[in-house]
Amino acid sequence: MAAAAAVRAGVNFTQRLNRISPVCRVCPLLRLNRCTGAAVRRAVDGFSAPSRRLRTSIGVCQSEDSSAPEEDAHAQEHIVNVVYIDRSGRRIPVQARVGDNVLYLAHKHGIDLEGACEASLACSTCHVYVSSGHYDRLPEPEEREDDMLDMAPLLQENSRLGCQIILTPELDGMELTLPKVTRNFYVDGHVPKPH
């Protein structure tokens, strides 16, 4: 929502600049230096800077013909193999990257792990059973996660919330079993889709 407001503010500022000096064809930032008078003051006074709390991310683009073998070896170091076992017992192997979230990874691969609260620790619909060899490699659950797990049906000693599992190289080969049922509260029969 903050990003949309920042974009709207930027568009409005650009429109105001165009009204100041429509003849000027130089960079909009230079138009302020060339134009004078009350019109400039009104345009600048009406502008509000976007929030500094706006979160951004940096993406890295790679070409498809990356032929450097050391890059391929480096990329392989960051691959984590995970197997989801769905409610019918079907095994779904997935290759993931270090740092991936188990809940979002399931959504990306069409696995029916609900996550109704979008990883905000407000439900237990992303409840999974972690394979015994990998459960001890996970960090201890926080108190909030334990509180949500207390509401999960069919709780076991190896139960965790998928939204709180971040993949590390030590978790390579981990198996995550989806419980037969989850508990979510629906209003008027509405069943939300995974996000």
UniProtKB/Swiss-Prot annotation:
Instruction: Give the species this sequence originates from.
Output: Danio rerio
- Name the residues that bind [2Fe-2S] cluster: C117, C123, C126, C163
In Swiss-Prot or TrEMBL terms, this protein is called Ferredoxin-2, mitochondrial
**Where does this one sit in the cell?**
Mitochondrion; Mitochondrion matrix
Q: Keyword Lipid biosynthesis, does the record have it? A: no
Q: Explain how, and how many, cofactor molecules are bound.
A: Binds 1 [2Fe-2S] cluster.
Keyword set, alphabetical order: 2Fe-2S, Electron transport, Iron, Iron-sulfur, Metal-binding, Mitochondrion, Transit peptide, Transport
MF GO annotations: 2 iron, 2 sulfur cluster binding; electron transfer activity; metal ion binding
Q: What does this protein do?
A: Electron donor, of the core iron-sulfur cluster (ISC) assembly complex, that acts to reduce the persulfide into sulfide during [2Fe-2S] clusters assembly on the scaffolding protein ISCU. The core iron-sulfur cluster (ISC) assembly complex is involved in the de novo synthesis of a [2Fe-2S] cluster, the first step of the mitochondrial iron-sulfur protein biogenesis. This process is initiated by the cysteine desulfurase complex (NFS1:LYRM4:NDUFAB1) that produces persulfide which is delivered on the scaffold protein ISCU in a FXN-dependent manner.
Which family does the UniProt entry place this protein in? Answer: Belongs to the adrenodoxin/putidaredoxin family.
PANTHER family registered for this protein in UniProt: FERREDOXIN-2, MITOCHONDRIAL, FERREDOXIN/ADRENODOXIN
The organelle transit peptide extends over 1-61
Listed GO biological process terms: [2Fe-2S] cluster assembly; [4Fe-4S] cluster assembly; electron transport chain; P450-containing electron transport chain; ubiquinone biosynthetic process
Domain 2Fe-2S ferredoxin-type stretches: 81-182
Fill in the subunit field for this protein. Component of the mitochondrial core iron-sulfur cluster (ISC) complex composed of NFS1, LYRM4, NDUFAB1, ISCU, FXN, and FDX2; this complex is a heterohexamer containing two copies of each monomer. Form a heterodimer complex with NFS1.
Give the Gene3D superfamilies listed for this entry: 3.10.20.30
Q: Which domain of life is it from?
A: Eukaryota
Q: Which cofactor does it need?
A: [2Fe-2S] cluster
One GO term describing the cellular component = mitochondrion
Recorded name of the encoding gene? fdx2
